[in-house]
A protein has these predicted regions:
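Membrane-interface "cap" regions at the ends of multi-pass membrane proteins
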Residues: 1-59, 166-169
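Loop-to-helix junctions at membrane interfaces in multi-pass transport proteins
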Residues: 2, 38-40, 44, 61-75, ...
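Residue-level recognition of pore/gate-forming positions within transmembrane alpha-helices
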Residues: 15, 52-53, 80-84, 124-125, ...
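Helix-loop-helix module between adjacent transmembrane segments
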Residues: 18-19, 51, 74-169, 223-235, ...
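Membrane-helix boundary/linker segments in multi-pass transporters
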Residues: 21-40, 94-105, 114-115, 264-282
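Alpha-helical transmembrane segments of polytopic integral membrane proteins
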Residues: 26-27, 56-59, 63, 88, ...
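Membrane-helix boundary/coupling elements in multi-pass transport proteins
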Residues: 123-141, 335, 339-344, 352-360, ...
Length: 457
């Protein structure tokens, strides 16, 4: 059975589950349609809110951010989870207390101002539009890779799916569908991570595997990762951030932004009591933490596996030939999310930190072709080459390398991780279903916000 067929089966079964739940939990009253009757249990609502929050950004991009940024990227974990502490303490109970269906209704009633309510509508539309673009883009990326369709086609399929179960079931249907999506995305995220953790460290718990020894090297896996990335000219994975104040302020910004996300806030209208709103925030944090506990391990191990793929004999030896690249790399090249440019025409894939040399070389080529400022582009190339030589004692230049030749979009690392690690085809199909569940769950929440805006206005 082909990988495409397996992907279709997993995605098709997950969609059938969502449609079935939407039909089973369809709204019977206006209250059920808009706020699920106001009777959703905090645990159920916490799971639905977690799915609503763990969008394509968390499922698809989070581990990629950690893989690229290392310790410095942990601000995203702290900020996004810390936002729920603010939400539980300062917002959630009061939203439920006023008993309004929408955030602008709450703002207008709380401040006795229609102007304030209108400003809230405008802010909500701006935030929602920006956020939903990312979710639908994530769905398009997942569809284009796993179902082998164009990005635009993937976006349209996602929109139809969301429209169907949102309109049919209302907020009640969305709530229970998002519970199912949470289960799907957590299974899809965790199972590949368990396989990879076992393969690299022998520990079945990815979060603990991150602090275990590498099976082959016999040293802690983070030590192994630090060694290979620094040998390639990158900053050590566990390197401290140079400016702690920036890190703190960035974390606070993420916390405040998380607490104010409109598609998350609206979920606190669906519980029976004010106390349940606070409990919902607590349970949401628990369910989100289950994924975020695994994300650092997924990111670190994905980066190590990617480097091992390019340098199978170790980073001190020659990289693989482009013609011998694995099938998963060929597939992702078709999506445009992996790009290769043979700068020195040796047929091999040089992936390293070239201090911007590769980008400067491309800019010089473009300037020569388009009649641009060739002198400035040439100077930029020389500056980058000097910086590279100073940093790495000219090792790469001496080897004949002329710049980094492989550009890997960090957003693909979670989706490509099972393929990079040579996991079974059914695991790849499972993560396809999980990636789509993550993108669709948040898209449904934002569709509902737009629908409420149209009803309100």
């Amino acid at each position: 059975m082909s990988q495409f067929t397996i992907n279709i089966i997993f995605v098709g079964l997950s969609f059938a589950l969502y449609f079935g739940i939407a039909i089973w939990a369809r709204a019977g009253t206006t209250s059920e349609f808009y706020v699920a009757g106001g009777g959703v249990h905090p645990v159920v609502n916490g799971m639905a809110t977690a799915a609503d929050w763990m969008s394509a950004a968390s499922f698809i991009s989070m581990a990629g951010i950690l893989a690229a940024g290392g310790y410095g990227a942990s601000t995203y974990l702290m900020g996004w989870t810390g936002g729920y502490v603010l939400l539980a303490m300062l917002l959630a109970p009061y939203l439920r207390k006023f008993g309004k269906f929408t955030v602008p209704d709450f703002i207008g009633d709380r401040f006795y101002s229609k102007t304030a309510a209108m400003i809230a509508v405008i802010c909500l539309i701006i935030a929602s539009t920006t956020y939903v673009i990312g979710q639908m883009t994530g769905a398009g990326v997942a569809f284009s890779r796993f179902l082998e369709v164009e990005n635009t086609t993937g976006l349209l399929i996602a929109a139809v799916v969301v429209f169907f179960y949102a309109v049919l079931g209302g907020m009640k249907g969305i709530t229970y569908t998002q519970v199912a999506q949470y289960v799907v995305l957590m299974i899809a995220y965790t199972i590949p991570a368990v396989f990879i953790s076992l393969e690299l460290t022998g520990n079945p718990i990815p979060g603990l595997g991150l602090f275990s020894n590498h099976v082959e090297a016999g040293v802690p896996i983070l030590t192994k990762l630090d060694q290979v990335v620094t040998d390639l000219g990158f900053t050590a994975y566990t390197a401290d951030v140079p400016n702690k104040l920036n890190m703190v302020l960035f974390t606070l910004s993420l916390m405040i932004g998380t607490a104010g996300l409109p598609h998350v806030i609206i979920r606190f209208f669906t519980v029976p009591k004010v106390a349940d709103a606070r409990w919902t925030a607590g349970w949401t944090l628990v369910f989100i933490s289950l994924l975020y506990f695994t994300a650092p391990a997924v990111g670190a191990m994905a980066r190590l596996n990617l480097i091992d793929t390019i340098y199978p004999q170790g980073v001190a030896e020659a990289p693989i030939n482009y013609d011998q690249r694995p099938d998963w790399m060929k597939t992702w090249e078709d999506t445009g999310l992996i790009k290769y440019n043979d700068l020195n025409n040796d047929g091999r894939i040089q992936m390293y930190n070239d201090s911007g040399l590769g980008a400067a070389e491309l800019a010089l080529t473009a300037a020569q072709a388009d009649g641009g400022d060739v002198a400035a582009a040439t100077a930029a190339v020389e500056t980058a080459r000097v910086a590279q030589d100073l940093e790495l004692n000219g090792r790469f230049t001496a080897a004949g390398w002329k710049g980094n030749e492989l550009d890997v979009n960090a957003d693909i690392l979670v989706l490509a991780n099972p393929e990079i690690a040579n996991l079974p085809p059914w695991v790849i199909g499972l993560i396809a279903a999980g990636g789509l569940a993550a993108a669709l769950s948040t898209a449904a929440g934002y569709y509902w916000l737009f629908r409420q805006r149209s009803v309100m206005t």
